[in-house]
Amino acid sequence: MDESHGLQEDRLIWMFTQMLRIREFEERVKRSFAEHPGLLRGHTHLADGAEASIVGSLTALRPGDQILTTYRCHGYPIVLGTDPRAMMAEIFGKRTGLCGGYGGSMHLTDVERGFLGTSGIVGQGIPQATGAAYAAQIAKRNQVILCFFGDGASKQGAFHESLNIASLWRLPIVYVLENNSYNVLTRVEQEDANAAAGEPLSVKARAYSMPGVTVDGGDPVAVYGEVSAAAARARAGNGPTLVESKIYRLSAHGNIIVPPEIPLHFPEHEAIEVFGAVEEYEAAKRGDPVPRFRARLIADGVLAAEQADAIAGDVRQEMAGAIDFGANSPFPEPADAVKFVYA
């Protein structure tokens, strides 16, 4: 591989496997929403198209590092080692879920593995992650925090307040801005002055005297290179970095279950049905990061096609088991509703 950033072949294969696991998990969730209305409850946001960005970023972590993410959160704990059966049970609202059925799709957490949680409110995980970095600095834990958020969150006041204080205090944090070009039904150029001017969103770092870089979020090795460099800088006491990872979500903004009498329509993708950008969407699908990385590993002799197929088969079996576990687990008892109520 031309630019492996020191990653060994077994690590590259591991990264490919994690990308497959995220994709298969999300495909199982998507199919369950479509084929079994009422089986899954509430709202879910899928990460298909973001697998390379997620895996590349998390590969840069060391044991003890921590992350916070957005509500589009399923992929991160999978990579960190969380049991996908517990995750699927949580999305099903079951007692055996990762959070006992209390959190659902948008509020996952696994503190033991460094996953501090998510935020259902756009941008509000950013100050929480900044606070975690401040705590790590005070405790001298030699720990780095990764904070993930989208392009829409970079317009929130919490984003600017957090970057200011993180730069001022040289906090050990890396801000990973996953720019998927759409904030629900709004293109990034319609709401972001930098994007409208043809600038990368990473230029926002300049206002806070911190480095800002933009990377192809469809290339997990390139993402790893930028995030690992930023993490090393943070760990050395040199403060935060803003990394813009340019991705393209391949599904609609979200999936939601509504009663059939409510006339709501959810598009396949906003690029097609709102903007008519069919070629843009088709080009994004042709650049899908999962088959793209598979082809790269095969071309570089890291992986044989038969090996890749065998890995994919194992992943399908694993996620089929996760769906079965989630569907067949028990619901919480009525008394569980007040289990964690203290006042």
Where in the sequence are the language-model features?
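C-terminal intrinsically disordered, low-complexity extensions immediately downstream
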Residues: N328-A343
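A short structural micro-motif
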Residues: I22, P63, D314-G321, A343
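A general secondary-structure junction signal
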Residues: Y71, S245-I247, V341
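Cofactor-/ligand-binding subdomain signature composed of acidic, glycine-rich
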Residues: M1-R41, D48, Y281, R292, ...
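Glycine-rich ThDP/TPP pyrophosphate-binding loop and its adjacent helix/strand module
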Residues: F115-D324, N328
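Conserved phosphate/pyrophosphate-binding and hydrolysis machinery centered on Walker-type P-loop NTPases
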Residues: A47, A312, F331
